[in-house]
UniProtKB/Swiss-Prot annotation:
Residues 1-23, 88-94 are periplasmic. The chain crosses the membrane at residues 24-44, 67-87, 95-115. It is a multi-pass membrane protein. Coiled coil: none annotated. This is Inner membrane protein YbjO. It comes from Escherichia coli (strain K12). Residues 45-66, 116-162 are cytoplasmic.
Amino acid sequence: MEDETLGFFKKTSSSHARLNVPALVQVAALAIIMIRGLDVLMIFNTLGVRGIGEFIHRSVQTWSLTLVFLSSLVLVFIEIWCAFSLVKGRRWARWLYLLTQITAASYLWAASLGYGYPELFSIPGESKREIFHSLMLQKLPDMLILMLLFVPSTSRRFFQLQ
């Protein structure tokens, strides 16, 4: 059979069946997108337009702060990209999402303990234990998403078959 091109869409004949995306993977991908979108909305609501401008201005005062600020934006975009790739069954997407969570948690932990720029990204707390507890509470939704991607047999099978 010959491929037909209709504008940007390409119609191809395929003899193999496509595996349906498990509901748990769909929920995880949607949760990633919704959590990151809600994070942005909450920041805008808390700081307002003027506060966002001041935050960006403060974030780009030195090269180190600019690097941290831009890295955090890149991290958010990578997480959203992973969400879309998860639905397509890309095996690497769940591992990349795990890596982004380890990176974010490690930086938050280090910045909160004074190794980095606490005024930009840090978790307030009196002791290491209190900071760690707050960090785990903050990362709880992301840990649940990771569990949805790695623990259920349907999720594991979906990524193995793709």
